[in-house]
Amino acid sequence: MNSNASNTPIAIGISQIFPCSYLDGQQEQLLVIQEETLDPILFDRLLAIGFRRSGSAIYKPRCPRCSACQPIRLPINEFMPSKRQKRTLAHNRDLTWRMTSEHTEAQYALYEKYIRERHFDGPMFPPSKSQYEQFLFCHWLPPTFIEVYDGNRLLAVAVTDTLPNSLSAIYSYFDPDEERRSLGSLLILLQCRLAKLQDKEFLYLGYQIDANRKMSYKRLYRPYQILTPQGWEYSQVC
C-alpha cells in the first residue's frame, strides 16, 4: 500500500488466526500496519478504508469465514439525534463536560470500576493500568479525553482521536452506579457535538457487529454509513 501523502510504501502484515473475542465459535484474523509511526493525515485515510487503532497498532479484520465486523461512521453535518437521544441530553443538563489531553488517576479509577462491574466476563477483565495504557495510548497520536462531571465527581470518559477530517471514538467508560443517565449514549452525543464544533466530516464509531448485542448499539445514531465492498453506503434502516 502507498501513502498518498508521501507516496512511500506502507508495510502491512497479517496476523495468525485466533478465536474471536466478539462472536463465539468464530475465528479472527487481522491486517496490521507494520509502521512504528504514522502521519495523522494518513491515519485519517486508513480509517476511511476500515482500519482502527488499538494502542499504537492499526488493524483491520480480515477473517477467513466471517465479515460480521462492519466499519461504521456518522456523517456529522447530517446527524440528527432521535427523540430518545434528545431526552438523554435533556436529562443530563445538570452535568458539565470538558476536553483534556491529560491522563489522570481519576480516569483510571473510573475505568477499573467500569470493567470490574460491567465487563467482568470479558477479555478486559481483570483491569490493570498497564493493559489500560497499552490499549488506549499511542505515542504518535495522543488521544483526547472527553470528561463528564457531576460537580467535582468524574462520571464518564470518552477516549477520542482527533484527525484532520474526523474524530474516532476509541473507547468510552462511565460510572455503573449512574446507569439511569445513559452515559454511554451521552458520550457519543458529546463526540458528535465536538466533531461539529471542530468542523469534522465524520465520527468513526469502530465496528458494528449485529450478532453481538453489546456491539449493536451504534446503529441507533442516524444517519450512519457502513463500509461495504462497494464503498461507504448509507443505512436503509428506517
UniProtKB/Swiss-Prot annotation:
Gene Ontology biological-process entries: ubiquitin-dependent protein catabolic process via the N-end rule pathway
Classification via InterPro entries: Acyl_CoA_acyltransferase, Asp_Glu_LeuTrfase, N-end_Aminoacyl_Trfase, N-end_Aminoacyl_Trfase_C, N-end_Aminoacyl_Trfase_N
Reaction(s) this enzyme catalyzes, per UniProt: N-terminal L-glutamyl-[protein] + L-leucyl-tRNA(Leu) = N-terminal L-leucyl-L-glutamyl-[protein] + tRNA(Leu) + H(+); N-terminal L-aspartyl-[protein] + L-leucyl-tRNA(Leu) = N-terminal L-leucyl-L-aspartyl-[protein] + tRNA(Leu) + H(+)
Top-level EC class: transferase
UniProt keyword Signal present: no
Record's keyword terms, sorted: Acyltransferase, Cytoplasm, Transferase
Subcellular location: Cytoplasm
Protein known as: Aspartate/glutamate leucyltransferase
